[in-house]
Amino acid sequence: MPQYRGDMATCGFIEYNDASPEVRAVYDDIMTTRQTDWINNFWKALAHHPPTLRRTWESIKQIMAPGALDPLVKEMIYVAVSATNQCPYCIASHTASARKAGMTDAMYAELMAVVGMANETNRLASGYQVDVDDRFKT
């Protein structure tokens, strides 16, 4: 039986040495792709259901790969959505990634101001049930 650890995680974490070959393969791909020697807790928690682990990793790997948006923009979007969804883990992990990609304290502060304002005005527009202007319709 795998050894689990994690004070907050519902099911605990599956460490590399305790992982099945299927889970280890995903862990190895994560470490290779990210050029790191460790697996963060999010993946260790998802490892309890290997199909979800693999599907989520493959999707994130594709979405976060080089594209029209640069890595900093993608991480800042992740921080914004994570703040709105109130996910402390995601806020912390993606803030660290955004800082690694070049986000400054000033950029973070401005991002949080935009997130706060967007959430407020979204709630106001929803509460007032504002019809979309014809000019904004696509």
Ranges and model annotations:
Residues 1-138:
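Hydrophobic alpha-helical segments
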